[in-house]
Amino acid sequence: MTITREVAGRSTCLRAAVGAVIVRDRSILATGYNGAPAGMPHCLDVGCLVYESRTPTGDLEQNCFRTIHAEMNAIAQAARNGTSIQGADIYVTHTPCIHCFKALVNTGIKRVFYGKPYKLHTLEEMRRYTGVDLVPVESPDSAPES
């Protein structure tokens, strides 16, 4: 998780610095952090484009149009480099959102090690069906080194 936190330091998001590291057999396959897509201005430079929406349960959510999540950036980096991530693990500073979790499932990620819990309840049913493990990491020493 130490490397994952270092990757998060590259984030250009004003709302949360999130990092992701995809690993197989103790080798880093790809990294990602949250920020603007290539060629777009960064939130750090021009501010966030926040929109609000309601969940099916009526909870208010705020998201940024400008931001691509760390997990998606890591998946994109692997794809650009022709690196298969099937059967790999991902270390993320925060629990993935439901959209990133679905993408991770479809890429063949087997385990998600996460630091800060974020809307964990939204992933429980999907986790049961997909078999992708969600593994909390409370300290840098509680998971295999990324």
Feature locations, PLM:
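Zinc-dependent deaminase catalytic domain
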Residues: 1-146
